[in-house]
Amino acid sequence: MSRWLMQMLMLPLLLLPLGQAAPKDGVARLDPEAQQQLTTNPFQPGPEQLRRLRDYLKGLEKMEEDPEQMNREQVLLYLFALHDFDQNGQLDGLELLSMLTAALAPGAAHFPINPVILVVDMVLETQDLDGDGLMTPAELINFPGEAPKRAESLPPALQEPQPAGSQPLLANSPLQSETQQSLGTKEEITSQVEAKRALEPEQEAGHHIETKVDALSPEGEARGQAESEGDAPGPREDAERQVESKDNEGEAKDLPAETLETQNTPNVVEAHSIQLENDEI
């Protein structure tokens, strides 16, 4: 009897530690939906992943645009800018952990060990292509196996930081390919102009040779004679020129007489004035 009583008294003492160690609802236990979300990459293209991220943005009070009207790239870029606390254009592990915890499992922040760390490791292993432990906007948007997005779709503030003298990571963007094509077209036009200039002296020399050959040929001689005959004055033109020359000679003969009369006029006037003075005296 006493032995059975002792066992009954010891039983609560044994169950007390187990009750304290059991997880409590809402504090140390995730709901099944959150546990399922932690098993997949939230940045993987798909309607379900996009719905989760949009739901998170809907809960933010400072959203100016309706998340339902935003596509996948816009949602990811907004999340990137929202959690890039040091504004260096890259997300480190802590910033990525803060983003995924707030978007996928807000209650996991109170866990002694955040289970979202496994998702961060999954994202870095899948999308951190250069292995530097940092996520850039291009790495966040361009999921492996998908077609790369256009580089100009990224806002200037989210462009990847590049060290001095290095090539941009998005060097194969359509914008740069168009620039290279325009440069190639310009080089082709320049080469064509230079080739044309190089051929101009040869064309001029060929033109002079053709002119000389044409002049030496019988047809060229006949053409030259016809042109010289066309330049020579005809009989009618000779007669007109002779008449004009005679008229000019007549005018030239009349001019000296008129000139003499003009020169003698002052002498006559002077003699007449002297005669008047003598009469008065």
UniProtKB/Swiss-Prot annotation:
The record places domain EF-hand at 71-106, 115-150
Question: Where expressed (tissues)?
Answer: Expressed predominantly in whole brain and kidney, with limited expression in heart, lung, liver, and skeletal muscle and no expression in spleen and testis. Also expressed in pituitary gland, adrenal gland, digestive tract, and reproductive organs.
What name is this protein filed under? Cell growth regulator with EF hand domain protein 1
Subcellular compartments: Secreted
UniProt lists compositionally biased (Polar residues) regions at 169-184
GO terms for cellular component: extracellular region
Residue ranges with Basic and acidic residues bias? 185-213, 234-256
PTM per Swiss-Prot/TrEMBL: Probably digested extracellularly by an unknown serine protease generating extremely hydrophobic bioactive peptides.
- Record-listed Ca(2+) 2 binding positions: D128, D130, D132, E139
Phosphoserine PTM positions read: S217, S228
Q: Cite the PROSITE patterns for this sequence.
A: EF_HAND_1, EF_HAND_2
Q: Where is this region: Disordered?
A: 146-281
**Lineage: superkingdom:** Eukaryota
Work out whether the entry's keyword set contains Methyltransferase: no
What does this chain do? Mediates cell-cell adhesion in a calcium-dependent manner. Able to inhibit growth in several cell lines.
Q: Which InterPro entries match?
A: EF-hand-dom_pair, EF_Hand_1_Ca_BS, EF_hand_dom, ER-Golgi_Adhesion_Reg
